[in-house]
């Protein structure tokens, strides 16, 4: 297995231009495909998850032109639903941001009735999709499971989504609601969506609603408990769509600045629509010095205090707090993160296991993790398992800010969202 060893880093300094956001990139491509008109999507992320969406759209008859560096994509909108070849099978890797929205969009009524299969990597077949399928079936969709009940692969017939009143469980993943919301305007009737349980990761729903607005569709949001969407609408291309820099990817660089120097990230700022921009607020609560601009966020070192906080609103960036916590002067507790368990891997178990390897004292619960700080000279050199999870690899690069090297196994797993991560991280590092 490939591995990379990061030598101890004495300080960090510099500016990082962030790659485009994964969440925004895949939403933008799907909305552009369904819209009337041509959309030029700029600052698109070049990564595995985006490639899976692009390959799927091509197979579904969407025409697009991708620039040589794969960051600009001109998409010719279909002005409505997909025309599906019968018995087409789409392989979506481990890309939840492709699997969930496409599951809903492919239920919409096509010109001719066809069946399509959605599948992916072995881990994708372990990631739940039951709540989305249940909600779509309530709205009249025709979906069946091909292997295990509640999980991909799926067979979908494009008979249409009728709309009406739909209840959806919001407690596992906000992507289920995102998928339903993005397809609802093309349903045959109006849709009223009621959320059962607590809706997780609300800021990701804000991203979805803002992007639907950019493509000409309004949704009535009643305190995240009920959403009303008019049916029989069309998305309208905004002609150009700029993808913001990835706020989740920003977290590793901002944390490095807070721990040991000063780092600025560009491509995201105080008006960002991404919830993970709030990661900088968490660093500030811990004591770091944060500066916000229109198009940048900067984090500067100060003494860091532990924190006890509900981080349900920033589940991806919360992982970065888990490794940052080792450099604080008191205990950190990250709460209400059950949905870590249904991500690329069971992140709660993985995080606790790997933190212990570097010498940390950790308590992992069903939906929380408690982490004790670790003096710089007590870190152990460990081989970090990444579980084919891009965020595990990136989070644990911060361990090199101690007096100890860290070895990351399978570093290429960052290709899911940030193929050049380790090159970029190296740029801000001053070695001993």
Curated annotation (Swiss-Prot):
InterPro entries: Enolpyruvate_Tfrase_dom, Enolpyruvate_Tfrase_sf, EPSP_synthase, EPSP_synthase_CS, RNA3'P_cycl/enolpyr_Trfase_a/b. Belongs to the EPSP synthase family. SUPFAM superfamilies: EPT/RTPC-like (SSF55205). The active site is at 316 (proton acceptor). Monomer. This is 3-phosphoshikimate 1-carboxyvinyltransferase. The keyword Membrane does not apply. GO terms for biological process: amino acid biosynthetic process; aromatic amino acid family biosynthetic process; chorismate biosynthetic process. Coiled coil: none annotated. It catalyses: 3-phosphoshikimate + phosphoenolpyruvate = 5-O-(1-carboxyvinyl)-3-phosphoshikimate + phosphate. Catalyzes the transfer of the enolpyruvyl moiety of phosphoenolpyruvate (PEP) to the 5-hydroxyl of shikimate-3-phosphate (S3P) to produce enolpyruvyl shikimate-3-phosphate and inorganic phosphate. Pathway: Metabolic intermediate biosynthesis; chorismate biosynthesis; chorismate from D-erythrose 4-phosphate and phosphoenolpyruvate: step 6/7. Keywords: Amino-acid biosynthesis, Aromatic amino acid biosynthesis, Cytoplasm, Transferase. Pfam families: EPSP_synthase (PF00275). The gene is aroA. Its EC number is 2.5.1.19. It is found in: Cytoplasm. Phosphoenolpyruvate binds at residues 22, 96, 127, 175, 347, 391, 416. One of its GO terms (cellular component) is cytoplasm. The keyword rRNA-binding does not apply. Its main location: cytoplasm. GO terms for molecular function: 3-phosphoshikimate 1-carboxyvinyltransferase activity.
């Amino acid at each position: 297995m490939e591995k990379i060893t990061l030598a101890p880093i004495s300080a960090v300094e510099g500016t990082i231009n962030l790659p485009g956001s994964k969440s925004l990139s895949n939403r933008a491509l799907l909305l552009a495909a369904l819209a009337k008109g041509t959309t030029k999507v700029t600052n698109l992320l070049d990564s595995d998850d985006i490639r899976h969406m692009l390959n799927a759209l091509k197979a579904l008859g969407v025409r697009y032109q991708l620039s040589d560096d794969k960051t600009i994509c001109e998409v010719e909108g279909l002005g409505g639903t997909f025309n599906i070849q019968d018995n087409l099978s789409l392989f979506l890797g481990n890309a939840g941001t492709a699997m969930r929205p496409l599951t809903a969009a492919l239920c919409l009524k096509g010109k001719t009735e066809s069946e399509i299969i959605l599948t992916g990597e072995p881990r994708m077949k372990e990631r739940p999709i039951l709540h989305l399928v249940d909600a779509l079936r309530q709205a009249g969709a025709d979906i069946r499971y091909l292997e295990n009940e509640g999980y991909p692969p799926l067979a979908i017939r494009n008979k249409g989504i009728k709309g009406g009143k739909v209840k959806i469980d919001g407690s596992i993943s906000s992507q289920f609601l995102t998928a339903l919301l993005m397809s609802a305007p093309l349903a045959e009737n109006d849709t009223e969506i009621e959320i059962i349980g607590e809706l997780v990761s609300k800021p990701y729903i804000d991203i979805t609603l803002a992007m639907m607005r950019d493509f000409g569709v309004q949704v009535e949001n009643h305190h995240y408990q009920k959403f009303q969407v008019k049916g029989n609408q069309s998305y309208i291309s905004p002609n150009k769509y700029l993808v913001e820099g990835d706020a989740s990817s920003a977290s590793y660089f901002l944390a490095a600045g807070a721990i040991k120097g000063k780092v600025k990230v560009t491509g995201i700022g105080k008006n960002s629509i991404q919830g993970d921009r709030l990661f900088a607020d968490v660093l500030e609560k811990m004591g770091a010095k944060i500066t916000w601009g229109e198009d940048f966020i900067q984090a500067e070192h100060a003494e860091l205090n532990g924190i006890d906080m509900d981080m349900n609103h920033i589940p991806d960036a919360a992982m970065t707090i888990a490794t940052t916590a080792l450099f604080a002067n008191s205990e950190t507790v990250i709460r209400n993160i059950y949905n870590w368990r249904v991500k690329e891997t069971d992140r709660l178990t993985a995080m606790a296991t790997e933190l212990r390897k570097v010498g940390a004292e950790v308590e992992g619960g069903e939906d929380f993790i408690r982490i004790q700080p670790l003096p710089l000279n007590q870190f152990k050199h460990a081989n970090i398992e990444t579980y084919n999870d891009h965020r595990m690899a990136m989070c644990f690069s911060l361990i090199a800010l101690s007096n100890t090297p860290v070895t990351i196994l399978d570093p290429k797993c960052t290709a899911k969202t940030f193929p050049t991560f380790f090159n970029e991280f190296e740029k801000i590092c001053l070695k001993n």
